[in-house]
Amino acid sequence: MTVTKRDGRKVKFDRSKIVKAITKAFVEVYPDELPADTYTFCAKIADDIEARKQDLTVEEIQDIVVRKLMASKYKDVATQYVQYRYQHELIRQSNTTDKTIKELLDGENEYWKTENSNKNPKVVTTQRDYIAGVTSTDITRRFLLPKDIVKAHDEGIIHFHDADYYAQLSLHNCELINLQDMLQNGTVINGVQIDKPHRLITAATISTQIITAVTSSSYGGATINLSHLAPFVRDSREWHRRKYLSRGISDGEADSWAMEDTQKEIADAVQTFNYQVNSMTNTNGQAPFLSVFMYLNDDPEHQEETALLIEEFLRQRILGFKNESGHYITPAFPKLLYVLDENNITEESPYWYLTVLAAQCTAKRLVPDYISAKIMRRDKVDANGNGNVYGCMGCRSFLTPYLDAEGKPKYWGRFNQGVVTINLPDVALSSGGDMTKFWELLDERLELCHRALQCRHERLALATADVAPILWRYGALARLPKGAPIHPLLHDGYSTLSLGYAGLY
């Protein structure tokens, strides 16, 4: 006979523990003198449980003890036993994180060394994030999630992602940052008004500050659109041109020298951007989990400027970054998303040279990732019947097509609320080869996933714009008034919830 403990371990039944626990309850009720039959009575209950010869959980054994005490003349002992059981449950619940946090701080558990390859658990900023995450997970499991969802997660039936960021109301998963709105219309970071920049080098620096602030207010990956920086390339070129014209330089020479200066500024801006993203640490204890979307046709008016930015990003990624030893390495971020379209997929196309450069970058640095505009337009069709091309979020999932109130496509400034994954192989194994049972189990577990996702949605729906102003008030995701609920942004397709699956290839 085995007993399943609360942590899932199976141990051999030990009758002496039953006798000891019941005897403690007798001692509390009869402190001066125990009834003469105390030990034989306790032993009889233990014998009855052992005689069942079936595997039980700790909770099932305790329930049997309570029923037998209540059926005897010792109902007062039953009451004391229930109180004892409840007090110990409170003790267990109030002390669930100490061991985990100690293992993290002392480096005793291999889990923390491999939990996230982008985080170093020896660094204090990462440890601070992990400690907060341990606390959030503990609160989530004990108070916030339904017990059957916690149980399904523990058993591997489903996976409830990111419980370490669930306790707070405002934290969502991934997003497409509306950099265009924030740069063109200004934004506010930590109470400081940031107006529209007038040169690329300034826009690039502000962008990294925005990225750090946004990724500190969410827990997934963020994506920006490189074409949102393209207008500032033109602004810089005009700035340099005016500089030379003011010195009496001819138009032709001014244009030539301005372009030369602009090329240098592009290189400096991209280098600044890359070093800022990789050297800054957000409140998640890591560099911002960022992707850069590189699509030539997103802003046709600034296609040439977008091409210049793409080229420089690829060249600098091929070069790599120096590590602390001075050797060039492949940086983790930003990830690059390169879109293949009609004007860059054949040798005759005008931007074929960029695709060649992207391939060289892939060969050396394993980036960029490639997106087919043709397939996107086929699969991402909006209510107007038009196909759309846009970036995936940092987590590599795509938003669904969406039209705003004016009937225009809207992607940048949208987000994902959270993720739950179903374990499909477990559904198959649990069905035992019975297809009818398989579909029944699949329906049951999908409904469990639906409820888990609904928990995510309802938790986020309690937030107001003030909990993360950079997101909800100052343009990254919305321009809501102070104190306004974010609830409307969680409905009608503006944001998404993701159902993942594990086990299919």
Give the ranges of each region predicted by the language model.
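Short, hydrophobic beta-strand segments
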Residues: 45-50, 290-294, 298, 505
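Charged, amphipathic alpha-helical regulatory modules used
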Residues: 1-107
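Extended amphipathic alpha-helical segments enriched in small hydrophobics
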Residues: 499-505
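Conserved catalytic cores of very large enzyme subunits
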Residues: 87-91, 97-494
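Short, conserved micro-motifs enriched in small and acidic residues
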Residues: 12-13, 494-498
